[in-house]
């Protein structure tokens, strides 16, 4: 965590307009420098200078889709770690087709999604309405399919949920940190995508990257727990959100080690 803050990685984000400010703030709080660019005249230049790339498909439109594809291909060519957040991929054919195309041609380093989103990518039926997932358990059969998916594509898959699941096809981990209130705040999953991009941006070594990804997932959950513990009587979700971002800006390795609930498989 401290090393990330000293390095201040530059993170290029092509994201949705619902959570764009929150993603920028989370990136700053976790020690990075956010930059959002979609104009084709500057896209190549900015992507090449970045330490990490995040593509979030929450609010798709044609120009953004083209920008996302251009940036992802540049990241692939230059060896820049990239994260794809296929928000609501289960909701429409457009999202499914675009996600499959950018995964095939852009080869992201990591895919992060809730269980409904990830099940859609691996070809399973999901329980959802719109972009909201109502999946609450991850079967061993689905776990094995996710591992195979990650291994075949040489990437990390992060499945967010009550228990988060992370795998690169060879190593896997479950994280039990977090609180139900995080699911009631718009964009906590998107914000996790920013943290994961930061986690990847520091290390070149695959094993170190995997451990840093697991740490980022656990850290975000711990921040949620601490944010909830700070709530007073009659303080609701907006105070919780403020506390969540606040905790991310002050959390340290000692607190993470004391509170992390990680099981490696």
From Swiss-Prot:
Which cofactor is recorded for it? Mg(2+)
Which annotated residues bind ATP? Answer: 112, 160
Which biological processes are named by the entry's GO terms?
thiamine biosynthetic process; thiamine diphosphate biosynthetic process
**Binding-site list for substrate:** 36, 187
Name the reaction it catalyses. Answer: 5-(2-hydroxyethyl)-4-methylthiazole + ATP = 4-methyl-5-(2-phosphooxyethyl)-thiazole + ADP + H(+)
For the protein in the UniProt heading, the enzyme class is transferase
Pathway given for this chain reads: Cofactor biosynthesis; thiamine diphosphate biosynthesis; 4-methyl-5-(2-phosphoethyl)-thiazole from 5-(2-hydroxyethyl)-4-methylthiazole: step 1/1
Keywords from UniProt, A to Z, are: ATP-binding, Kinase, Magnesium, Metal-binding, Nucleotide-binding, Thiamine biosynthesis, Transferase
Q: Which InterPro entries match?
A: Hyethyz_kinase, Ribokinase-like
Question: Which Pfam families does the record match to this protein?
Answer: HK
Q: From which domain of life does this come?
A: Bacteria
A GO molecular function annotation here is:
hydroxyethylthiazole kinase activity
The role this protein plays is: Catalyzes the phosphorylation of the hydroxyl group of 4-methyl-5-beta-hydroxyethylthiazole (THZ).
Q: What family does this belong to?
A: Belongs to the Thz kinase family.
HAMAP family associated with the record = Thz_kinase
Q: What is the name listed in the Swiss-Prot or TrEMBL entry for this protein?
A: Hydroxyethylthiazole kinase
* Source organism: Clostridium perfringens (strain 13 / Type A)
